Regions:
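Non-transmembrane catalytic domains and loops of membrane-associated enzymes and transporters
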Residues: 1-200, 206, 213, 217-221
Length: 221
């Protein structure tokens, strides 16, 4: 579950009453300081949104829409995502029973099981490109039935937009003609399939920079 780009209806907020801080919001400075305090080692965490919301907690207002800039070039987006991945893996110690604190040492980790799951899910997402590339390579050169492995990876990449398209067809707004609704859904599907095609084309590079960020972080830690 990607907490950063699927904020219209948030599963964590809907089911557990606890959202994920996504970098924009209103917060009580004093309450935030009391909650986080000396929890984190200085200058050791690049990605702090989820870990801070785990301690301070956050609620999500799904009806509020915010806008922010997005990198104009793929290279800039890669640098940003690589920094995020490094930050996510810096949070690996907070999955353990005892976590680091400011000034050195460790203390009992007070994060809830839900907060730890969010951290783990972020780590899982950074492993998706390397895993998909590994499946393709193993399917082509090691396992039998390479076509089946290839189709499986393609289904994972292109299956979600097709499922979203099927669901979107049932959500026509009142006053919108069926033809206009269908055209809008087809346009959205086409754009998403193009983005996913680029994801497939860039898969080797995406796998490389994910592994590079992960291994650099683990080595330095």
């Amino acid at each position: 579950i990607d907490p950063y780009t699927r904020s219209v209806s948030d599963v964590y907020q809907d089911l557990f009453g606890q959202g994920s801080f996504i970098g924009k919001g209103i917060y009580d400075v004093d309450a935030f300081e009391r909650s986080t305090g000396a929890r984190f080692p200085d200058n050791r965490i690049l990605s702090h949104d989820l870990i801070e919301s785990g301690f301070a907690r956050s609620g999500l207002l799904s009806e509020v829409q915010l806008y922010e800039g997005y990198p104009a070039r793929y290279s800039a987006d890669v640098k940003r995502r690589q920094r995020w991945i490094r930050g996510d893996w810096q949070l690996l110690p907070w999955l353990l029973p005892r976590a680091p604190v400011r000034g050195g040492g460790r203390e009992r980790n007070p994060l809830s099981a839900l907060s730890r799951w969010k951290l783990l899910d972020n780590l899982r997402r950074s492993l998706v490109p390397p895993a998909l590339l590994a499946v393709l390579i193993m399917g082509w050169f090691v396992f039998s039935h390479p076509l089946a492995w290839t189709l499986g990876v393609l289904a994972l990449i292109f299956g979600l937009p097709l499922a979203d398209f099927a669901v979107g067809l049932t959500g026509k707004s009142p006053g919108v003609s069926s033809l206009r609704h269908l055209r809008a859904q087809l346009h959205s599907l086409g754009l998403q399939l193009l983005r996913d095609a680029l994801t497939l084309a860039w898969l080797p590079f995406e796998a490389w920079y994910c592994l590079d960020a992960i291994l650099r972080t683990l080595w330095r830690e």
